[in-house]
Amino acid sequence: MEEEKNWIVVPTWRIPERLERWHSLIKHLKYNTKDLQMACYVPHHKVGWAWWTCSRVIFPLRDETHLEVQGYWNLAPEKGWLSTYAVRITWYSRNFWTDVTPDYADTLLHSTYFPCFSEGEVRKAIRGEKLLSCCKFPKAHKNQVPSLQYLALTVVSHVRSQGEDPTWKQWRRNNRKGLRMAKQNSRRNKQGSSKSPAEGANFPGLAKVLGILA
């Protein structure tokens, strides 16, 4: 008697491209800029028995929780083989775990990683002084109800980016540079180049980097 196939069903996000772009950006932010120094990158040959997993990236968060992004390959649908890759994004606490959307994962990441406006920037903005910090992960605020302080600082930084101060223009360009840097570094890895990627790139968000929801 032929044994029936057992299926393991988990929610995943299909991605249109391979995961080199994601791996490249994670390694750059972990080893070069140190923005993700606490993150743990596990390549496919260290995953172990889970042969369908091509990588795991674990982000320790506050209060003994962590976020995990698993990349899948060789997935089998009902017919044929899945030609594209997929990722699963899961949040874990001590006694509970749940799958989360890319947007909410960005919010969780920003609670621990990537600097935002400092507490004293609101007072500086009111006094008309030069702001010395900026949010390096603006995508994480996309689905949140922004505070009045965050809105005010965003407006101030936007106005100054249109003026004479080139620093704020650079902050805005950095939001786009993150994804571009990941693409370029991925190509360099394929070509065997040892040239280091550009520094100062902001994190563009999980959905943007992985290409999901495109």
From Swiss-Prot:
Position of sequence motif BC-box-like motif: 147-156
Motif interval(s): HCCH motif: 110-141
Residue segments, region Multimerization: 154-166
Disulfide bonds: none
Keywords: Host cell membrane, Host cytoplasm, Host membrane, Host-virus interaction, Membrane, Phosphoprotein, Ubl conjugation, Ubl conjugation pathway, Virion
Protein name in UniProt: Virion infectivity factor
Transmembrane segments: none
GO biological process, one term: viral life cycle
Region (Disordered): 166-201
Membrane topology value: Peripheral membrane protein
Stretches with biased composition (Basic residues): 170-190
Induction, as annotated: Expressed late during infection in a Rev-dependent manner.
Gene Ontology CC terms, in alphabetical order: host cell cytoplasm; host cell plasma membrane; membrane; virion component
Any Pfam family the entry gives: Vif
Further comment: Vif-defective viruses show catastrophic failure in reverse transcription due to APOBEC-induced mutations that initiate a DNA base repair pathway and compromise the structural integrity of the ssDNA. In the absence of Vif, the virion is morphologically abnormal.
Localization, UniProt: Host cytoplasm; Host cell membrane; Virion
Family affiliation: Belongs to the primate lentivirus group Vif protein family.
Keyword set includes Ubl conjugation: yes
Coiled-coil positions: none
Quaternary organization: Homomultimer; in vitro and presumably in vivo. Interacts with viral Pr55Gag precursor and host APOBEC3G. The interaction between Vif and APOBEC3G is species-specific, which may play a role in restricting the replication of SIV to their host. Forms an E3 ligase complex by interacting with host CUL5 and elongin BC complex (ELOB and ELOC).
Gene name per UniProt: vif
Primary location recorded for the protein, binned into one broad class: host cell
Post-translational modification Phosphoserine, affected residues: 147
Domain characteristics, as noted in the entry: The BC-like-box motif mediates the interaction with elongin BC complex.
Protein purpose: Counteracts the innate antiviral activity of APOBEC3G. Forms a complex with host APOBEC3G thus preventing the entry of this lethally hypermutating enzyme into progeny virions. Functions as an adapter molecule, recruiting APOBEC3G to the ubiquitin-proteasome machinery. Targets APOBEC3G for degradation through the assembly with elongin BC complex, CUL5 and RBX1. Binds viral RNA and affects the stability of viral nucleoprotein core. May play a role in viral morphology.
PTM: Processed in virion by the viral protease.
